[in-house]
Each structure stands twice: as structure tokens, then as C-alpha cells.
Amino acid sequence: MFGVGIDIIEIDRIRKSYQTYGDRFLKKIFTEGERVYCFSKSNPYASLAARFAAKEAVAKALGTGIGKLLKWKEIEMCRDSRQPQVVVPEALLCSLGVKRVLLSVSHSREYATAVAIAE
């Protein structure tokens, strides 16, 4: 195993950020596919918060954080099945010696959380 990352966020924090900054906030953090998926849900803020937590957890598991080596939109959470999949630049994974990143996300009424394992 290379690393483990975990994150938790209040869903209301994402809602307030969207209400304050609008599309500018969304376009900085989330890919177009993530935005479309989340706003197709009855509670888009819970889905957005889960993806935000996932991005943070992945960055922690890789040990890069969000910044120079890894940008927000370079981490994309996809749902091809019931299990969430995460897409990260292959070149970065290779440079770190990471073969894959596993992801688990969940949310309640108030919080979203994610755990990522890089191996």
C-alpha cells in the first residue's frame, strides 16, 4: 500500500460556496461530467460534497495535496457501476509508483465523507 486519505465535509459548506460564487466555484473544482451528474440528482449538494471529499482524500492518499502536482479537476469521480471510480493523471500515478486508487464515499443529511487507498 502506498497511502491512505480520508476527508469529511459539511454539505452546507458546498451549498453556501455555490450560492456565494456560483458557476465560478463549480468550474474551478468539478469536471463537466461531475457537474452534470450532481445536478441530475435530487440533492446536488450532497453529491458535490461527496466528490469534494473524494478529491481531498485522493490527494492525501497520494501525498501530493491539491496544488502544483495535482489540480482539482485532474481528479474525477465517475460512476460506471455501483462502486465509485476515480480518474487521476496516469503520468502522476506512474511517477509515484501507484498502480491504482480505490475509493469509498458516503453522505448523510449533513456530511459527506470519502476514503481513498493508493496502492
Curated annotation (Swiss-Prot):
Cofactor: Mg(2+)
Compartments where found: Cytoplasm
Membrane-spanning intervals of the chain: none
GO terms under biological process: fatty acid biosynthetic process
Principal location listed in the UniProt entry: cytoplasm
E.C. number(s) listed in UniProt: 2.7.8.7
Domain of life the protein comes from: Bacteria
Keyword Cytoplasm: yes
EC main group: transferase
InterPro entries assigned to the protein according to its UniProt record, in alphabetical order: 4-PPantetheinyl_Trfase_dom, 4-PPantetheinyl_Trfase_dom_sf, ACPS, Ppantetheine-prot_Trfase_dom
Catalytically driven reaction(s): apo-[ACP] + CoA = holo-[ACP] + adenosine 3',5'-bisphosphate + H(+)
GO cellular component: cytoplasm
GO MF annotation list: holo-[acyl-carrier-protein] synthase activity; magnesium ion binding
Residues holding Mg(2+): 7, 56
Record keywords, A-Z: Cytoplasm, Fatty acid biosynthesis, Fatty acid metabolism, Lipid biosynthesis, Lipid metabolism, Magnesium, Metal-binding, Transferase
Reported function: Transfers the 4'-phosphopantetheine moiety from coenzyme A to a Ser of acyl-carrier-protein.
Similarity comment: family membership: Belongs to the P-Pant transferase superfamily. AcpS family.
The protein's name in its UniProt record: Holo-[acyl-carrier-protein] synthase
Species per Swiss-Prot/TrEMBL record: Chlamydia trachomatis serovar D (strain ATCC VR-885 / DSM 19411 / UW-3/Cx)
Gene behind this protein: acpS
